[in-house]
Each structure stands twice: as structure tokens, then as C-alpha cells.
Amino acid sequence: MHIEPGILSGAKIAAANLAAIALVAAQAPQLLRKPQLVLRTLLAALFFSVFMQSFHLPAGASELHFIGAMPIYLTLGFVPALLGFGLGLLLQGVVFEPADLLHLGVNFLSLAVPLLALHATLGRRLAAGAATRIGAVLKLDAGYYAGVALMVGFWPAMGEVATPFAEWTAFAAAYLPVVLIEPVFTVAAVRLLQSQAHRPLVQLCFAVPARG
């Protein structure tokens, strides 16, 4: 989901950075109201970074990553997932790919806007009671990664260099296995945490309720 340097003009990168800052600023006050979200945001950034670095390869106009979006969202919550994506991208840029820091806002929006849209629609309805059902999690994954694919298509469409449509379709198609495999991982993680939800440390670190 990374956008390569040279595709967007400096003005568009600056606009994306401002939009990213505004999105983070809108959610950050919740960390003050609920201090446990700070820990969960750090965990989200850690898990996201591990997932991203564990598997990545070129795919069409961008790169294919195992993002782990739904495991993070359903076990840590919306705000930690959203802010954790931004913090994780920042840490990965500093440690592994300094060149990616130029597009930090762009790459953050590619992940955050689909999550925001999903949370406002399917997420609120399905996340609470359906996180242990493969079919429901599959809907969340499909909705989220469709959004990521659209965002990755949006940036080249706004770019200074023409990107062949075939490259975007190759990128979008590359995420189909992720959409099919990630729900299994998500449900397993949620069920494991639910079985341990009575433990104080799990209650502090995760947003998974105990099994009813």
C-alpha cells in the first residue's frame, strides 16, 4: 500500500500530510480520556509493524503487505488501530525505510480512511458481537481491503505520472488471498483473548469481552 516517491507533487503530499494530522488530532483526545488506549495504541503500532515487516512484496502499482488490520481493530479497538497505523508507519520509516517518511501522510491515509469508513458503517454493527464468526469477519476484511485498494488507486490518479490501470488491478487482486486468510487468523486471536479475558492484564491491554 506504499506510494512510491515521484508520483505525487509536493503540494499534494503537503495536503495529504495536513489531512493526516487533522485526522490524528481529531482522535488523539480520547487517549487523555481513556489512558488505557495509550497502551493499546502502542501495542497496535507494534503488532502492525511486525505484520508489515513479516511479509511484503511488490504488487502492481504498490506493495502487498500483511497488514493485520482486522485482528488489530477487533482486539484493540478503533482508536488504537487508527493511531497505531500512523505510529507504526512512522517507526518503520525511521528504522527501515527513511525514504517512506516523505509519504507518511499519504500512506497513513491509505490505511486510515478505509478504517474510518468501515468503523462508521459495518464495523459498529458487526464488531461487537460477530468477531468470532468467520463470515462476519470476512465482510469486514473485504470492505476494508477494498477501501485500501481504492485509496491506492486514488493517489496515482491524482499523480504527476500516469500509472497503467493494469498495475492497479494487479495490486487489488493481490489482496484477495489476504482477504480470505486473515479472517481465520482474526477469529483465532479473538477467541484466544476471550478465553483469557478474565485476567487483569488482558483486560488492560485488549478490548475483547469475555465469552458470554
Residue ranges and their predicted role:
Residues M1-A45, A142-F154:
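Membrane topogenic helices and adjacent juxtamembrane segments
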Residues H2-E4, S9-G10, L57, G123-A207:
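Membrane-embedded alpha-helical hairpins and interfacial helices in multi-pass inner-membrane proteins
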Residues A20, F48, M52, S110, ...:
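Alpha-helical transmembrane segments of multipass membrane proteins
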Residues R40-A59, A81:
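A generic, lipid-embedded transmembrane alpha helix
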Residues T41-S49, Y73-L76, A112-L116, L138-V152:
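Small-residue-rich segments of transmembrane alpha-helices in multi-pass membrane proteins
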Residues A45-F48, H65-M70, L87-Q92:
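Hydrophobic, membrane-inserted alpha-helices
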Residues M52-P58, L89-L118:
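Interfacial aromatic-anchored transmembrane helix boundaries in multi-pass membrane proteins
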Residues F66-A81:
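Generic transmembrane alpha-helix motif of multi-pass integral membrane proteins
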